[in-house]
């Protein structure tokens, strides 16, 4: 009886080894019922655990984008902030800004448009579909601030709106215009433009003056 028991066990082990070779699995000298029991005991990861794992991987991949050296130098400069306009002042009552915007109940939108040669900024009241104030690097009065250059295609002298410094100045100008009208907070709408280069410089220039983005 003892010899027959050993023979049967050896035959079962041999059959298990052959089965593993056929299925292209690694050879395990264990009976089949033990293999199935181990598979059942394995815990499946929940969807929450999967999402947390994916988020951790994304955070590790993300790296902090370094700012440009020109913008860092501009941020170190001392900028004169615009004095806050009182809510019930005569200038505020005559302006085209609603009382809800001045009190902060409704927040207008700072729309930015960036091209190769120029940058545009305008503050829009989406409720009334009205432009409250705007500025751009094409304004002839800003030639001394932004600087000029001669365009080869047209042989015309135009404002230099291609640099980070020009975007910084445009940001300061739009910020001063907004604060003088009683607008202290805006939503920054950069559209399809990435938050880098001139777009970032414009936003930081508006913040430097005292405008909340």
Swiss-Prot record:
GO terms for biological process: ribosome biogenesis; translation. GO terms for cellular component: apicoplast; ribonucleoprotein complex; ribosome. Pfam families: Ribosomal_L18p (PF00861). SUPFAM superfamilies: Translational machinery components. It comes from the Eukaryota. GO terms for molecular function: 5S rRNA binding; structural constituent of ribosome. Gene3D superfamilies: 3.30.420.100. It comes from Plasmodium falciparum (isolate 3D7). This is Large ribosomal subunit protein uL18c. Its main location: plastid. Belongs to the universal ribosomal protein uL18 family. Signal peptide: none annotated. The keyword Phosphoprotein does not apply. The gene is RPL18. The keyword Ribonucleoprotein applies.
């Amino acid at each position: 009886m003892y010899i027959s028991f050993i023979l049967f066990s050896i035959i079962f082990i041999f059959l298990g080894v052959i089965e593993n070779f056929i299925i292209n699995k690694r050879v395990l000298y264990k009976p089949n019922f033990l293999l199935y029991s181990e598979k059942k005991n394995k815990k499946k990861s929940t969807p929450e655990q999967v999402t947390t794992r994916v988020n951790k991987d994304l955070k590790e991949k993300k790296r902090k984008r370094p700012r440009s050296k020109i913008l860092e130098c501009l941020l170190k400069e001392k900028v004169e902030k615009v004095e806050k306009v009182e809510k019930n002042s005569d200038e505020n009552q005559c302006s085209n800004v609603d009382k809800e915007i001045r009190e902060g109940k409704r927040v207008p939108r700072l729309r930015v448009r960036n091209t190769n040669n120029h940058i545009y900024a305008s503050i829009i009241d989406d409720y009334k579909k009205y432009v409250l104030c705007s500025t751009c690097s094409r304004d002839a009065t800003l030639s001394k601030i932004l600087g000029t250059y001669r365009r080869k295609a047209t042989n015309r002298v135009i404002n230099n709106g291609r640099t980070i410094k020009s975007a910084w100045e445009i940001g300061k100008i739009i910020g001063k215009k907004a604060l003088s009208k009683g607008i202290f907070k805006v939503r920054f709408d950069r559209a399809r433009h990435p938050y880098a280069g001139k777009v970032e410089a414009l936003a930081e220039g508006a913040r430097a003056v005292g405008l909340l983005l």
